[in-house]
């Protein structure tokens, strides 16, 4: 074994990018099968392989960072740049949905009745469940910041409490969103209003679930004393992602729920 004379992490060959890509293919194909043939077999297979890939990839990264010491300051700097670029790519992803919404709503076509919301659509009241959802996510933004400050100050118990509150609020948001979808007086097939509403809020909801998963992993890692006040990039990345999810929701609330109604 050669001695490493640099501060960078030469990653070992890993099967997880390949299995992750295959699970994504299975999930997207399974989604189409579910929509068109009402069969969830392929979707469940895709979700299962995705969960297994996530578990094993996370396990490898935790081992490399916490137990093998591969995440030197230089490596952490690279990971921070990577996370920033990833969040920028997510901003552009959601920009497409806002573009579609404003393109349709600012100049409604005669097919929509020349008005927005389109004729026959009864939008949700922005001062009911959507406003509660907004307050839940804003509260979770406060609690994740509390968790971050507690971690930097070395206060483990407060960090765990704040992180648990954030996860609980994230799960509560998801349940509220699911109930709102169930009771909505329009569907994804109700023209451009239904499609832009459900695609934009649905992808945001998916990001909340991903962010909650990220935070749950951080919670269990903190229970096992993986984070210190000066070495906790895994948690920092999760906090950045959660704040991004917060900000996207504020734009969704103001644009689609409040102005769009």
From Swiss-Prot:
Membrane side Mitochondrial matrix: residue ranges: 1-15, 67-72, 153-155, 224-232
Pfam family, one: COX3
Chain segments annotated as transmembrane: 16-34, 41-66, 73-105, 129-152, 156-183, 191-223, 233-256
Record's bilayer topology term: Multi-pass membrane protein
Primary location recorded for the protein, binned into one broad class: mitochondrion
Segments on the Mitochondrial intermembrane side according to the record's topology features: 35-40, 106-128, 184-190, 257-261
GO molecular function: cytochrome-c oxidase activity
Entry's localization field: Mitochondrion inner membrane
Keywords: Membrane, Mitochondrion, Mitochondrion inner membrane, Translocase, Transmembrane, Transmembrane helix
UniProt-listed SUPFAM superfamilies: Cytochrome c oxidase subunit III-like
GO BP field: mitochondrial electron transport, cytochrome c to oxygen; respiratory chain complex IV assembly
Catalytic activity, as annotated: 4 Fe(II)-[cytochrome c] + O2 + 8 H(+)(in) = 4 Fe(III)-[cytochrome c] + 2 H2O + 4 H(+)(out)
EC number per UniProt: 7.1.1.9
GO CC field: mitochondrial inner membrane; respiratory chain complex IV
Similarity field: Belongs to the cytochrome c oxidase subunit 3 family.
Function text: Component of the cytochrome c oxidase, the last enzyme in the mitochondrial electron transport chain which drives oxidative phosphorylation. The respiratory chain contains 3 multisubunit complexes succinate dehydrogenase (complex II, CII), ubiquinol-cytochrome c oxidoreductase (cytochrome b-c1 complex, complex III, CIII) and cytochrome c oxidase (complex IV, CIV), that cooperate to transfer electrons derived from NADH and succinate to molecular oxygen, creating an electrochemical gradient over the inner membrane that drives transmembrane transport and the ATP synthase.
Subunit annotation: Component of the cytochrome c oxidase (complex IV, CIV), a multisubunit enzyme composed of 14 subunits. The complex is composed of a catalytic core of 3 subunits MT-CO1, MT-CO2 and MT-CO3, encoded in the mitochondrial DNA, and 11 supernumerary subunits COX4I, COX5A, COX5B, COX6A, COX6B, COX6C, COX7A, COX7B, COX7C, COX8 and NDUFA4, which are encoded in the nuclear genome.
Official protein name in the record: Cytochrome c oxidase subunit 3
Annotated organism of origin: Gazella cuvieri (Cuvier's gazelle)
Name of the gene this protein is made from: MT-CO3
